[in-house]
Amino acid sequence: MNFKKPATLVLVSLTSTGGWAQLSSPPNAPVQDMGRVEIKSNRDNDTEERRQSTAAKIVIGREELDRQGDGTLGEVLKRLPGVTIQGAPGRGGAIRMRGLGGGYTQILMDGQRVPPGFSIDSLTPEMIEKVEILRAPTAETGARAIAGTINIVLREGLRANPDDLKVGSSFENGHRSEGLNWVHNIKSEALIGTFTVSAMNMWRPEDNNTLTDTEVDALGKLPAGSSHRERHTENLGHRQGLNANARLMWRGEEGKTLVLMPFMVYSEFNSLGHIDLTESKTVGGQSQSFSSDSAQTSNNSRFVMTRLNGQWNQRFSADTRFEFKFGLGESHYSYKFNQTELGTSGLLNTMTEAQAFKDLSQSWNGKLTQVLQNGHQVVSGLELEGVRRTEEAVADVMDDAGNMRARTQRWAVYTQDEWSINPHWNAHAGIRYENILTEGVTSEGAKRNQSAVLSPLLHAVWKPQPDSKDQVRMSLTRSYKTPTLVNLVALTSLSREANSPTRPDRTGNPGLKPELATGIDVAVERYLTEGGVLSANVFRRNISDLIRYVTSERYDTAWAPGQRRFVSSPQNVGNAITQGLELEAKFRMDQVWTTVPAIDIRSNLSFFHSRVLDVLGPNNRLDQQPSMTANLGGDYRIRSMPLTLGGNVNFNPDYTTRRSNEQWAYQGAKRVVDVYGLWKFNPATALRVTVSNLVPRDYLTGTTYIGNGFSETANTNTRNWQNVQVRLEMKI
């Protein structure tokens, strides 16, 4: 990949703002009286934790989490370096690091993998103490993190803090939603703890328009001709949710502590919608038919999850500590979709789909930490995890979708050592072995998959001077991505409308192998004297046995033997390479120019490039990885009044992905502007106004299939709207 042009542009921009050298004080610079006293904030502690870590880590604490008044954690993460959100602007979606999601990005909660079915959008910033982002895996956090790891640390109890209460309403396209967040701190002598409750009553409109064009030439298996379909869908969804978690810590004698962390999520969603569909066909160059149809739809779903995490710490001596963690969880999900045809053409069938699953999960982790006399800190651990799923599904499209029983068992053992080689060098080396077994039984028979991976991992930090604020990080790692339960043993899902390359049936593949990646990361960091950081990071991952959904034309399916069906299933398609450049700058403007206002600047710029070697180019990139992502944000406190103003601009360009020699996918550009104002009436009461997606733009996506004398393109336009939130924030 050629990074010269982007890198040059960034260097020019840094130079124009005074450069790195200007942002730090010269060693012998005289002390100037600035006329005010600077007080260190929690943000400085987050920056210091980042600087002291041997493995590359970004820490986002309470100050950053609260800054913009975001409604979900995903809205906070989208502004971080290299992080993108899948889907339309303002609609949430899967979190992706370096443009990679779907198993490439590992999500942890309090250091443990999140339970099945958990959505990061179910967490509000008020429920979280801090977020740690690791760009390279470690033996302790796990190697299933080709793109990186996001560790969410839930709220911790602090004796001195009063309760927090936040009540607000938001408005989107004429629909009002409400939300409440309450944080209660326990202040007893024997117990330190926090209870957090978040409730929502949200209305969300949706408006999609899909145009599908199909052509069959003389070489196809159908008569030469073409068709044009236009599908317009409108929905109004209503979501009600209640999330609660607690962190309770008892301190015993001689370094003994017990922490219990119960967690509960309840979410119910209902929507009513309307579909209008028209289709025109041409055969032999002459109009053959024109049809139209419409339907009413209803969608009802419910998700309930309860989980108890626990942690026991036992300090045997000043240098030896044992930690035991456990997690027990249960989740239930039910879903029902009804479609009622209003016309008579048969383009939209009257149908019902229903699905329900139950997951039972448990995890048991033990870790021993020893500080040796020669300065080495050795951590060794054993992990056990099990998940059982029972699923029932019914669909009227063809036959019953059937039932499924599946289980996943995982165990891992690891050891790592962190030490200081000399005042200039720190190192962190580890090795991890992990074994995963997945078994399932469906109406299509029994399926089984087992994989084992050994991952050596090495990190190092070099400082030009022992007390230097400049440092260079290096990582050489082995990471991997395992097939998901859905990839391996999923029930066959049939297309609701006429089967085609852009509306295929979907099924699993029990023969998948895990993706393996060898990676290297190199970063240069400068920590500024008065707070802030400048960093540049380059990375590369060489991936083997890449997993990708591929659509094929089949006549031998078990559910429609002898019929022509387009089927999408996951396959190991070969090898891939991904690499990138990540730049970050966080500073206060008066650190550069003393005469300008003290505006806090947060900016990052990332460039990505990838190639799937067994797919012809151009655009043979990894799925849904943009070529770049950028954020520019700022905050300013007006000193003459109790008002703080701020905002952020997020940008992802449009791009095309060639998924196979016959398939292409298009993702439109995303430009999201968020602004806010915070008025403090007194230290305990404030009013916040936030405008998300200030300048809404339609979001475009598309898919194309060309092969065997058959071509089809489907383009979807998704509308989105400005969201205005008004929230009262109180400390009680």
Located regions from the model:
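N-terminal periplasmic accessory domains that precede
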Residues: 73-76, 93-96, 133, 145-167, ...
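N-terminal periplasmic "start-of-domain" segments of outer-membrane beta-barrel proteins
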Residues: 36-68, 93-94, 102-105, 158
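Outer-membrane beta-barrel signature, preferentially recognizing the C-terminal barrel domain
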Residues: 301-305, 357, 406-408, 478-543, ...
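Extracytoplasmic beta-strand/coil segments of soluble accessory domains associated
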Residues: 74-112
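Short acidic/polar hinge/loop motifs at secondary-structure boundaries
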Residues: 85, 96, 112-138, 182
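C-terminal beta-signal and adjacent terminal beta-strands/loops
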Residues: 651-658, 678-732
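Gram-negative outer-membrane beta-barrel transporters
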Residues: 427, 535, 539-542, 560-655, ...
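Face-selective signature of the C-terminal outer-membrane beta-barrel domain
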Residues: 245-267, 296-447, 462-463, 467, ...
